[in-house]
Each structure stands twice: as C-alpha cells, then as structure tokens.
Amino acid sequence: MYSNMLVSCSNCRTPLQLPPGARSIRCAICQAITHIADHSRYAPPPPSIPTTPPPPSTIAPPSPYNHAPPGPPPNQHGRKKAVIVGISYKYSRHELKGCINDANCMRHLLMTKFQFPQESILMLTEEETDPYRIPTKQNMRMALFWLVQGCQPGDSLLFHYSGHGSRQRNYNGDEVDGYDETLCPLDFETQGMIVDDEINETIVRPLPQGVRLHAIIDACHSGTVLDLPFLCRMDRNGQYVWEDHRPQSGIWKGTNGGDVISISGCDDHQTSADTSALSKITSTGAMTFCFIQAIERGHGATYGSILNAMRTTIRNTGNNPGGGDVVTSLIGMLLTGGSGGGSGGLRQEPQLTSYQPFDVYTRPFSL
C-alpha cells in the first residue's frame, strides 16, 4: 500500500522513502521518528455542503523525540544552517591529520563570530558516534540535501569540507578544463566520489532568491568544485578579473535566484596542503587555517580582503615554513597536542567563485 511513498520528516522536513507497510520511519539526518496514519481503516466521509474551511493551524506538532535537533530558530534576519565535513581517512593510505581539527575550528568560528546556533550545525566526521553522521557518500548526500531543504529568503547557509579532493575526465562538455572536480567521502574507494555536477544540482541550482550560500572547500583540485559560472582570477598585486566558466553546452550552473559564493583551497590543477607549518601546534588544512585567521585578524570586511590575507599567509609560509608566529587566539584555544610531520613550502592559491561577478573590494563579507 505504501510502495514508493514519500513522506516528510515531522521535524526537519527531509523527504523520506517509506518502506512498504511501514507505520513509522526514523529520519537519518535528525533522528526524529515520523508516524504514519493508516487511512485505509476509515471510510471516506459522505459528500457535504461546501463550507468555508477553517484557518490552517500555526502550531506544529511536537517532535516525538525531544533530543532531536529542532533546527535553527527563525529570526528577523532569517535562519542560519551549516554542514561541516572533516575526513581524516584514518588507518588508510590516504590518511590526513588536520581535517577533523578543521571541522572543529570552523564550528567554533561559526558559533562565536557569526552566531550560528549549535543545533543548526550538522557535523560529519569519523569521531561522531551517530552512524548517520559518519562522512560516507550517502550521509554526505543527505546532509547537503538537508542544508537547502526548506530554505527561505533571508536564510544564510554554509557548507565546509576538509578532506581529499580529486578530478576525473569530463565527457558532457560542461567543464572548461575538460575535468570534473570531485570530493572524496570516507568510503570513496568502494562507493565512489561526489562529482561537482551533483553538488551543483543539489545545493546551487535549487537556491531561491533571498537565500545566501557560502562554501568553504579545503581540498585538492577544489577551485570550481561547486561548478559556479564565474571564477575570480587574482594576481599577487590584488588585481583581478572574472573568468567566464559557463559551459559551451549551455547547461545552466547558476542558481534559482539565490546567492552562492565559494572560497576554495586552490585552483583546479593544484593540490591543497595538510600541514603543521601554520598552526605550530597540530596539523590543519592550510586553507581553513588561513580563512579563520583572516577573520580573527580583522581582514573579513570584504571578499577581496579575505582572499588577499589568505594568499599572503600561504605565500609567506611557503617562503619561510619554519618561521613566524601566525597562531590566532581561536586556533590556539581549539588545537591541543602535537603532530608529526611538518610541511615544505605550500604551493596553492585560494580561489573565489560565484554565481555572478561582483566587486570583491566593496561587497561586504557576511555569513
């Protein structure tokens, strides 16, 4: 009777596929249980004279699980939601040391500097005890869907990823360089990577007018991993031009009126460092560290000032990987313990992509 039936989670509104005959289902994102009424027990009411329908109730039914995340509370400026993914690939030949540190630092930054409610931040790392918050391919897909689900004008969304990135040959003609950029979930060797086309379809194209999305991507080959139409090409003097990356195939890669900007760790042909040369305490992703430091040191007024500050820090580290004190109060507070393996010079240039060109030195940065 319920074959292929879709229902919405009673708490976070994520669409769920109900198994045949089931009377309830647990949401993989927020863990709330949604109960399904069996309408087959009741005969339809007889036809009656049309009357004016009562006004719809404004009181939402309570969640059956009080401990389930209720979602970000609405306010006059809209809601704030974030998905933060940090993958260390522990005990594998792909292991990274800094990615879970990146995730913890980013969560703290969002809560303390940008007033993101803790309950509106969905963390996916190997340290999570909830199996639905382990950064597998399926869980990452569901988290990205949750991020944009039900968004409304005034909402501010953020996606942060720290982990491996890669690229693969593109065959549909929608990439200027001939390659699709990819993110590597924890189980990518068996389940495959998440391709930029899918990320664009999930969190970029559906975004309605009045909603803002920022992506902070600390991974190799990540310059255009959201497949946004325009890339800001900036030189060492801070001069920039916007490159048009709209595919010749005519496939639309923009939004449904929303505002999307991505700051990524490096260009599509570059690799992104996992290093202890920056924090001097433990390994972090170079890009994540430099982004947080730019905000902490007061360089977060505009997108141009952030990008310049990040690039300067990485260049200085590349020229002098062993010197200089660049530990901010936030990093120093969050990161404890030692790490092995420093880094040589860093060869990467953080990139900015957008759904449309804008003046990076006059547009205020805001999350």
Predicted region positions:
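Short linker/helix segments within small regulatory modules
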Residues: 18-26
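Glycine- and acidic-residue-enriched helix-capping/strand-helix junction motifs
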Residues: 90-104, 108, 277-283
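Caspase-like (clan CD) cysteine peptidase catalytic core
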Residues: 133-162, 166-231, 298, 304-306
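Active-site-proximal C-terminal subdomain of hydrolase catalytic domains
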Residues: 196, 200-206, 210-331
